[in-house]
Amino acid sequence: MIFLNINNLNVSIEGKKILDDFNLTINQGEVHAIMGPNGSGKSTLANVLAGNEDYEVNSGKIIFKDSDLLDLNIEERAQAGIFLAFQYPVEIPGVNITPFLQSAINAKLKNNKKPELDNLSFAKILRKKAEALGINTDMLKRSINTGFSGGEKKRYEILQMSILNPEFTIFDETDSGLDVDALRIVTEGINKFKNEKNSFLIITHYQKLLDYIRPDHVHVMRNGKIVKSGDISLAGEIELSGYQNF
């Protein structure tokens, strides 16, 4: 089943073209990885999929589950099942993690015409998922990402993903700034969440992340478009010789 279909997408920012007739198809349950040098358009793609209005879509289509994604705003995309894990998660002082996540999941449940979770029911779910990810429950009393280490910020994003249960998750260089132990914890969380009903797009510079999360397809991106696609062996080729051959 085709889950996401991007067809001839052209995107610019401040008059500069970033994505150039970009095409990509992701089926339900698949994990795709996009690799490429700085400036190739990887993060632009992630932001456009999530609905960042700083980018201008000049032409093309993005079909997600039979709906035109370009007709939906950021909130509508989130409610439709899209989740973006940022390269640099922002700090939100004064906004506590627990009520924020409860409000987010209840908004999604309400949108899907399902009963909302009361405080006790949500607290039990949150604690269980936090413990499964190795997150100290004291962290749940803090403001979002405020004073967090790089690893804590990434773990919180995985917790958020686990709570919201999105159908399509985009990881924009989620391995950036992580040491080996933090990378292992984060990728274990992703692998626990992965199943045949949800799909992933992993954007990264390095093969190391793909040693932990084995993608079904690997793509090389340069100058705003995919220039080569293959399996995990393509990531190994990049590790050995870089991007000069593409």
Where are these regions (language model features)?
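The feature captures the beta-strand-to-loop junction immediately N-terminal to the Walker
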Residues: 35-37
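ABC ATPase C-loop
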Residues: 161-162
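Walker B catalytic motif
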Residues: 170-174, 181
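ABC ATPase NBD Q-loop/coupling interface
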Residues: 61-77, 145
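Q-loop/switch helix immediately C-terminal to the Walker
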Residues: 84-88, 94-110, 122-125
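Conserved beta-strand-loop-alpha-helix hinge in the C-terminal portion
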Residues: 217, 221, 225-246
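Conserved hydrophobic segment flanking the Walker A/P-loop of ABC-type ATPase nucleotide-binding domains
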Residues: 26-28
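Conserved structural motif at the start of ABC-family nucleotide-binding domains
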Residues: 4-6, 19-21
